[in-house]
Amino acid sequence: MPGGPGLLQALCATTFLLFLISAGGLGPGSQALWVDGGPPSMTVSLGETARLQCLHNRSRLSSKLNITWWRVLQGNATWPDIFLSYGKGPNGELTIDTVNKSHMGMYRCQVEEKDLNQKILSSQQSCGTYLRVRERLPRPFLDMGEGTKNNIITAEGIILLFCAVVPGTLLLFRKRWQNMKFGVDAQDDYEDENLYEGLNLDDCSMYEDISRGLQGTYQDVGSLHIGDGDVQLEKP
């Protein structure tokens, strides 16, 4: 076969060269640029600080990364995204201080990898995170832990039990001491005081008026002065 051995050697050399190139491209420091998709949403309260991170991994150690944050406008897909700021720190963080209702929306980060000549080698962007803003939760009147609340309830129960048992016990001991000191006489005097309890005073006055009226119809013989003897005494 004409040119057979030479053609076979050329194919082997080409295959070996392609293998070396691919091995060098997949070696350390030559991996592809990677950007995390990020959380689908984030919820913060009014007045708080929102922090969005752009996790990424560069493909070359000598390259330079440019991280920017963009806000996606809602309602029309043809509208361009609004540039917000550059990412700060190793994770390209976006910080929004004193969040209000106007900050609600979709945010995404974009990572551009450049070489020493500021040439863009690759570019990736996150899927986007929707920022939700809610009303601040009302602060409870007693802002304390559950353990502290349980201790307070236990102390209140002990105090209530003390206030209910101790006065009753003292009254019982006082009554017992009075009975032992004064004896039965005090009880008899108390009964004598209540001997006429329930007696109707109006009935008593009526009987008293009747008795007084009867006394007026009789005459005392001893004190009667008889003159001429024609005085007649009434028989009872």
UniProtKB/Swiss-Prot annotation:
Major location category of this protein: membrane
Gene Ontology terms describing biological process = adaptive immune response; B cell differentiation; B cell receptor signaling pathway
The PTM entry states:
Phosphorylated on tyrosine, serine and threonine residues upon B-cell activation. Phosphorylation of tyrosine residues by Src-family kinases, including LYN, is an early and essential feature of the BCR signaling cascade. The phosphorylated tyrosines serve as docking sites for SH2-domain containing kinases, leading to their activation which in turn leads to phosphorylation of downstream targets. Phosphorylation of serine and threonine residues may prevent subsequent tyrosine phosphorylation. Arginine methylation in the ITAM domain may interfere with the binding of SYK. It promotes signals leading to B-cell differentiation.
Which intervals hold domain Ig-like C2-type?
33-122
* Signal sequence segment: 1-32
Q: Where is this site: Required for binding to BLNK?
A: 218
Annotated Gene Ontology cellular component terms: B cell receptor complex; external side of plasma membrane; IgM B cell receptor complex
- Going by the entry's taxonomy, the superkingdom of the source organism is recorded as Eukaryota
Residues with the modification Phosphotyrosine, per the entry, are 196, 207, 218
Residues with the Asymmetric dimethylarginine modification = 212
Q: Which UniProt keywords apply?
A: Adaptive immunity, Cell membrane, Disulfide bond, Glycoprotein, Immunity, Immunoglobulin domain, Membrane, Methylation, Phosphoprotein, Receptor, Signal, Transmembrane, Transmembrane helix
* Annotated TM spans: 152-172
- Show the disulfide pairing: 54-109
| Parts of the chain on the Cytoplasmic side | 173-236
Residue ranges of the ITAM domain?
A: 185-213
Q: Name one GO molecular function term.
A: transmembrane signaling receptor activity
User: What does the function comment of this entry state?
Assistant: Required in cooperation with CD79B for initiation of the signal transduction cascade activated by binding of antigen to the B-cell antigen receptor complex (BCR) which leads to internalization of the complex, trafficking to late endosomes and antigen presentation. Also required for BCR surface expression and for efficient differentiation of pro- and pre-B-cells. Stimulates SYK autophosphorylation and activation. Binds to BLNK, bringing BLNK into proximity with SYK and allowing SYK to phosphorylate BLNK. Also interacts with and increases activity of some Src-family tyrosine kinases.
Q: What is the recorded name of this protein? A: B-cell antigen receptor complex-associated protein alpha chain
Designated gene of the protein: CD79A
